């Protein structure tokens, strides 16, 4: 996370750009891989939620009431069962304080906020959802069918977010430089491992491991293949052959989830 002041400043600028209404920024939820509780895919927070609220926990929503100048972090505190899995976790109130938000409330409050805004014909600004659980949540809250949510998303909010995130501050540039260093380590690792008899999957696994060792995760699934003509040639158990060209397309995210993209070619001579 950056400093509390960074997130306060970003939200203030967002309010100036959007001008009026209620902004709702949805964080991501855990996504089960094979079964609930401890079978999740690696958690990845929504980037826009991170930009304005900076918090990595699942099940959070940021609400910015521009006209009344009220910011609220919405989310439920963990229960005793969750403590078994996660240990001691900061309360939603404590999380809000960390990023300069003075108000917090349980998730059920979000429905009340939305109903109140709609009853007063106030504009509710959302971004186009891309996860199905969030699409269902938007449907429950605002009555907008998932098939219509892209069209109903706020263009004012989209333009404001694009404008702000397109300009990088010094602390963001430093994050991109960290991502560049990790990416360099990933691609030079691939170059060192390429030799006849090694599988594509082995090389890709080592490359991805570098991202997890020095950053938070890969920025997208590592592509490593002797079939460079295929755009998404994910690694297989194919064995590297002498004289063949191998394509490595891989990148990493820093602990603050900033990333760069790289592509390299390697050939065994």
Protein language model annotation of sequence segments:
Residues 1-185:
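A composition/biophysics-driven feature that prefers long, compositionally simple stretches
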Residues 171-192, 198-211:
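Active-site pocket-lining segments that scaffold enzyme catalytic pockets across diverse folds
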Residues 28-29, 67, 78, 227, ...:
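Anionic group-transfer/hydrolysis microenvironments
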Residues 29-30, 205-219:
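Short beta-strand/loop turn elements enriched in aromatics
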Residues 52-56, 65-66, 229-258:
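Acidic/histidine-enriched ion/cofactor-binding microenvironments in catalytic or ligand-binding pockets
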């Amino acid at each position: 996370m950056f400093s509390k002041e960074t997130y306060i400043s970003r939200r203030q600028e967002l309010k100036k750009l959007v001008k009026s209404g209620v902004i709702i920024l949805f964080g991501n939820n855990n996504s089960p891989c094979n079964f609930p509780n401890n079978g999740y895919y690696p958690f990845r927070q929504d980037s826009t939620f991170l930009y304005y609220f900076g918090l990595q926990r699942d099940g959070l929503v940021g609400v910015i009431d521009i006209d009344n100048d009220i910011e609220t972090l919405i989310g439920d505190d963990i229960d005793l069962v969750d403590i078994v899995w996660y240990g001691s976790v900061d309360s939603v109130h404590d999380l809000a304080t960390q990023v300069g938000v003075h108000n917090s409330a349980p998730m059920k409050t979000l429905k009340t906020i939305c109903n109140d805004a709609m009853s007063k014909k106030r504009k509710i600004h959302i971004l186009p959802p891309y996860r199905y659980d969030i699409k269902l949540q938007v449907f429950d809250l605002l009555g907008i069918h998932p098939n219509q949510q892209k069209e109903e998303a706020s263009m004012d909010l989209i333009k404001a977010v694009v404008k702000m995130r397109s300009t990088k501050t010094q602390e963001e540039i430093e994050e991109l430089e960290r991502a560049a260093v990790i990416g360099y380590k990933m691609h030079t690792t691939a170059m060192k491992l390429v030799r006849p008899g090694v599988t594509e999957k082995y090389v890709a696994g080592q490359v991805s491991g570098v991202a997890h060792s020095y950053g938070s995760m890969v920025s997208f699934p590592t592509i490593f293949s002797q079939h460079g003509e295929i755009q998404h040639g994910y690694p297989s158990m194919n064995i590297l052959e002498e004289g063949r060209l191998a394509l490595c397309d891989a990148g990493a995210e820093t602990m603050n989830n900033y990333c760069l993209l790289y592509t390299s070619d390697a050939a065994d001579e």
